[in-house]
Amino acid sequence: MATKIFSLLMLLALSTCVANATIFPQCSQAPIASLLPPYLPSIIASICENPALQPYRLQQAIAASNIPSSPLLFQQSPALSLVQSLVQTIRAQQLQQLVLPLINQVVLANLSPYSQQQQFLPFNQLSTLNPAAYLQQQLLPSSQLATAYCQQQQLLPFNQLAALNPAAYLQQQILLPFSQLAAANRASFLTQQQLLLFYQQFAANPATLLQLQQLLPFVQLALTDPAASYQQHIIGGALF
């Protein structure tokens, strides 16, 4: 495609030159002399009359003298500048076509570092725009790790106890709701601790345990409202 464009531009430049040029017969020597300005030395004009040396001598004479630019050169300069700009564009496209495969090969060879750079790109932009937020994000995994470490440290004695003595660990698991209740409501926990002593005392005697179950509402009433419990005892004594 680039070759076709270059060929068309060269044809355009040649057609411009041909359209602005004047055709003279080869046997005539007058046109060359007429093209030379009158202020050139006469020896240059005589040398240019030689047919073999005419093209070369004419070029030398024009290049050595300070001849004003002719209208023909002014007409040819836009076409030449256009050709030069297009040639530069074609060269840039060819260079790009040569460089892009090399870049792709480098990316494929270093795909892992390239992917890491793409992943870290938002963090780099954030560190540039807002360093404080970037530092918070950097400290966030450390904070999460510290929280998990503290939880593991708290559970470490229970894990060691479970490994050494499973029975004691199960007892602790059974008592865990009571511990949570103690943390949430201390009064209810104390009530349960008082009732636990009664359960442990009468667990060996089922009959006594049944009596304790029957008396449990009165015990709870005595713990919550001693005055009402005392009144119930007086009423019960009067009835019996």
From Swiss-Prot:
Belongs to the zein family. One of its GO terms (molecular function) is nutrient reservoir activity. It comes from Zea mays (Maize). Pfam families: Zein. Residues 1-21 form the signal peptide. InterPro entries: Maize_Zein_Storage (IPR052508), Zein (IPR002530). This is Zein-alpha M6. The alpha zeins of 19 kDa and 22 kDa account for 70% of the total zein fraction. They are encoded by a large multigene family. Structurally, 22K and 19K zeins are composed of nine adjacent, topologically antiparallel helices clustered within a distorted cylinder. Keywords: Repeat, Seed storage protein, Signal, Storage protein. Zeins are major seed storage proteins.
